């Protein structure tokens, strides 16, 4: 398709450029904006109506005027030059290298606006992904092909958790090719330096592709970045048959950018000012996770978001929870106690956990052990609340054991060092060790055979 150039810029409003008399502009079409001083900037068509093209500019609008500005329509949507050589590299929000390395010699240029995986073509998620974190592996297991978000709050250690998962995540079969695609949106320069240093110093970068968008970068880059990251993941997973873990942070910043652009377009706002199509937009990102029938590759997603005001009913976590398959919740109360990573297992859930655990995946006792730990910890937390009213002296001896179990469970199971990588065997054995402080007769959720084989109770 020939590239057509127009000089009919009628208005500039915030990050948007309005170009008149453009009869055939296409939705998501890429454009080059040529200034009268010779400078060129990129943009993308957000909307077209009656010959008017609304273009979102990548970058500042400084220096762009209605006179002398030429807009060249490329006749194609955004495409990413892609190659296996992207592993070990760091890119900005639109896929340009920012690590001082050479340009990528593309083996292919792929459209970044890929569709969600066709349900008929999907294979059911299965197989365990080990993160090395007990609260996830033991009680909210991540399954290959799943989308499992992390719900956090401002000031909580979700950045450290993201870096730790990226460093430690693995599939148990060492013959499988595994890699991480990491995308960060709207982060500060300090956070960007933290992530790049962590990935480099720990060696995680060698099996990772990083995309970083700073808070000072254009909002449109935050909209494009997750799609670029997922396009990279799809190439590695479905063409190179690798197992890819995609970590996206912070999806709240993504939604804020969506709201900003929607406001600039003067669209009717939905809940709390977010666009009414935010659910659909988020689904086009989350539904790109999964496995394809007849293909050995897979894409597993861990989107991370901060809940404004720690409100889990806020539109961003609320809509994310509808689309994804569970959630891992980082607790402010546990964080105040000095417990890292501070995952609240009672508020967390992995809906696909049963498909990736048990005999042939992790260990035969995994499901029952997790249920027993949930039950014991919940009982201990209930007794904490009761103790605040009646005092510990009013509790029975058995109740006091559950009260102490809750404290021990938080200090030994939920708490672990940033560089502590626990195997699934270590996590399961630790669970049995903690349960040994409770009466064996109370173990109603684990099979007697498993108690006999794995239990740590002393024989009298």
From Swiss-Prot:
Domain of life according to the entry: Archaea
GO BP of this protein: proton motive force-driven plasma membrane ATP synthesis
MF annotations from Gene Ontology: ATP binding; proton-transporting ATP synthase activity, rotational mechanism
Cross-referenced CDD domains: ATP-synt_V_A-type_beta_C, ATP-synt_V_A-type_beta_N, V_A-ATPase_B
SUPFAM superfamilies recorded: C-terminal domain of alpha and beta subunits of F1 ATP synthase (SSF47917), P-loop containing nucleoside triphosphate hydrolases (SSF52540)
Keyword Membrane in record: yes
GO CC annotations on file: plasma membrane
Keyword field: ATP synthesis, Cell membrane, Hydrogen ion transport, Ion transport, Membrane, Transport
Main location: membrane
Membrane topology value: Peripheral membrane protein
InterPro entries, per database record: ATP-synt_VA_C, ATPase_F1/V1/A1_a/bsu_N, ATPase_F1/V1/A1_a/bsu_nucl-bd, P-loop_NTPase, V-ATPase_su_B/beta
Compartment(s) of residence: Cell membrane
Subunit organization: Has multiple subunits with at least A(3), B(3), C, D, E, F, H, I and proteolipid K(x).
Role description: Component of the A-type ATP synthase that produces ATP from ADP in the presence of a proton gradient across the membrane. The B chain is a regulatory subunit.
Family of the protein in this entry: Belongs to the ATPase alpha/beta chains family.
Record protein name field: A-type ATP synthase subunit B
Organism of this sequence: Thermoplasma volcanium (strain ATCC 51530 / DSM 4299 / JCM 9571 / NBRC 15438 / GSS1)
């Amino acid at each position: 398709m020939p590239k057509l150039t127009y000089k009919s810029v009628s208005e500039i409003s915030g990050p948007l450029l309005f170009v008149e008399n453009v009869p055939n502009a296409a939705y998501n079409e890429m454009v080059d904006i040529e200034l009268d001083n010779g400078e060129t900037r990129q943009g993308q068509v957000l909307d077209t109506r009656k010959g008017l093209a609304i273009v979102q500019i990548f970058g500042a609008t400084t220096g762009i005027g209605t006179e002398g500005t030429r807009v060249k329509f490329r006749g194609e949507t955004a495409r990413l030059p892609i190659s296996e050589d992207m592993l070990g590299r760091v890119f900005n929000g639109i896929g340009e290298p920012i690590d001082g390395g050479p340009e990528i010699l593309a083996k292919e240029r792929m459209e970044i606006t890929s569709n969600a995986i066709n349900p008929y073509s999907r294979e059911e998620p299965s197989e365990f992904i080990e993160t090395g974190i007990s609260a996830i592996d033991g009680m909210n297991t991540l399954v290959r092909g799943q989308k499992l978000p992390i719900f956090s709050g401002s000031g909580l250690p979700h950045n450290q958790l993201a870096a730790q998962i990226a460093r430690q995540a693995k599939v148990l079969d060492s013959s499988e090719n595994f890699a991480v695609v990491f995308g960060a949106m709207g982060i500060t320069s300090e956070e960007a330096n933290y992530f790049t240093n962590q990935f480099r110093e720990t060696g995680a970068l060698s099996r990772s592709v990083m995309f970083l968008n700073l808070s000072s970068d254009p909002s449109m880059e935050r909209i494009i970045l997750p799609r670029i990251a997922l396009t990279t993941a799809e190439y590695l997973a479905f063409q190179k048959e690798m197992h890819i873990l995609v970590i996206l942070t912070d999806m709240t910043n993504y939604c804020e950018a969506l709201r900003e652009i929607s406001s600039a377009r003067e669209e009717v706002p939905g809940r709390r000012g977010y666009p009414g199509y935010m659910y659909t937009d988020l689904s086009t990102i989350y539904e790109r996770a999964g496995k394809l029938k007849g293909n050995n590759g897979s894409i597993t997603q861990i989107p991370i978001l901060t809940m404004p005001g720690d409100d889990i009913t806020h539109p961003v976590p609320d809509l994310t929870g509808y689309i994804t398959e569970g959630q891992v919740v980082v607790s402010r109360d546990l964080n105040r106690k000095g417990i890292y990573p501070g995952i609240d297992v009672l508020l967390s859930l992995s809906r696909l956990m049963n498909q990736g655990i048990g005999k042939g995946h992790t260990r035969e006792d995994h499901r029952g052990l997790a249920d027993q730990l949930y039950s014991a910890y919940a009982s201990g937390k209930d007794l904490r609340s009761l103790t605040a009213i009646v005092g510990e002296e009013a509790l029975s001896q058995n109740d006091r054991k559950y009260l102490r179990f809750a404290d021990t469970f938080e200090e030994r199971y939920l708490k672990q060092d940033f560089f502590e990588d626990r195997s699934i065997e270590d996590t399961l054995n630790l669970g049995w060790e903690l349960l040994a402080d409770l009466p064996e007769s109370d173990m109603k959720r684990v099979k007697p055979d498993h108690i006999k084989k794995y239990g740590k109770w002393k024989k009298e």
